[in-house]
């Protein structure tokens, strides 16, 4: 059931942010928003979301630097972090995965499958 799933959506483009937030909320997710890498790290430490969707190009620290900070903190190290980016080249995906992202979703999002793509990245406690 997704009504208890909390997603931290990190996106600095207001149009992309609104679309992704609206789609996820319609699907029953609770969506927290951050527009910078610094804000994402701070919110994740307090809210401990179930999954973080992280744009890679952000003002201030980028998605890769924010991921490193999240992984270095025991409060946030185990939260799945999924790269959400317009970079669609294989080398970009490989770089994100090598950096430690748990997944990679391309923008623009496909509104029909986006909620299911997010669900696929949730960690379950039971096998």
Give the location of each predicted region.
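Active-site residues of response regulator receiver
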Residues: 55, 85
């Amino acid at each position: 059931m997704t009504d208890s799933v909390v997603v931290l959506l990190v996106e600095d483009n207001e149009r992309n942010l609104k679309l992704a937030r609206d789609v996820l909320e319609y699907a029953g997710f609770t969506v927290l928003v951050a527009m910078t890498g610094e804000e994402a790290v701070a919110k994740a430490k307090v809210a401990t979301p179930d999954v973080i969707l992280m744009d890679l190009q952000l003002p201030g620290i980028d998605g890769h630097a924010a991921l490193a900070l999240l992984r270095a903190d025991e409060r946030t190290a185990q939260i799945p972090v999924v790269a959400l980016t317009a970079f669609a080249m294989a080398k970009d995906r490989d770089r994100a995965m090598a950096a430690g992202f748990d997944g990679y979703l391309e923008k623009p999002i496909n509104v029909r499958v986006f909620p299911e793509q997010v669900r696929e990245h949730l960690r379950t406690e039971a096998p």
